[in-house]
């Protein structure tokens, strides 16, 4: 999970971010949303990788690349 401090720093880097006030109850909701988004991105990237490259018979670790994420990110953003 992204730390509260890191999340606040990221949110405050937008235009006019110095004047932005973030309510304490909002941060856990944003953290949860980001956790769900990241989990979904990983699962979709994994499925896309398997669809393109086929199932592997061995049990060696699977390595995802930025290309796997690029294939799914457009639809993922629309779905979220």
From Swiss-Prot:
GO MF entries: DNA binding; protein heterodimerization activity
Alphabetical keyword list: DNA damage, DNA repair, DNA-binding
GO cellular component entries: FANCM-MHF complex
InterPro entries named among the record's database cross-references: CENP-X (IPR018552), Histone-fold (IPR009072)
Gene3D superfamilies tied to this protein: Histone, subunit A (1.10.20.10)
GO biological-process terms attached to the record: DNA damage response; DNA repair; kinetochore assembly; replication fork processing; resolution of meiotic recombination intermediates
Domain of life the protein comes from: Eukaryota
Subunit structure: The MHF histone-fold complex is a heterotetramer of 2 MHF1-MHF2 heterodimers. Together with MPH1/FANCM, forms the FANCM-MHF complex. Component of the inner kinetochore constitutive centromere-associated network (CCAN) (also known as central kinetochore CTF19 complex in yeast), which is composed of at least AME1, CHL4, CNN1, CTF3, CTF19, IML3, MCM16, MCM21, MCM22, MHF1, MHF2, MIF2, NKP1, NKP2, OKP1 and WIP1.
Family (UniProt): Belongs to the CENP-X/MHF2 family.
Described function: DNA-binding component of a FANCM-MHF complex involved in DNA damage repair and genome maintenance. FANCM-MHF promotes gene conversion at blocked replication forks, probably by reversal of the stalled fork. Component of the kinetochore, a multiprotein complex that assembles on centromeric DNA and attaches chromosomes to spindle microtubules, mediating chromosome segregation and sister chromatid segregation during meiosis and mitosis. Component of the inner kinetochore constitutive centromere-associated network (CCAN), which serves as a structural platform for outer kinetochore assembly.
Full protein name: Inner kinetochore subunit MHF2
Organism the protein comes from: Saccharomyces cerevisiae (strain ATCC 204508 / S288c) (Baker's yeast)
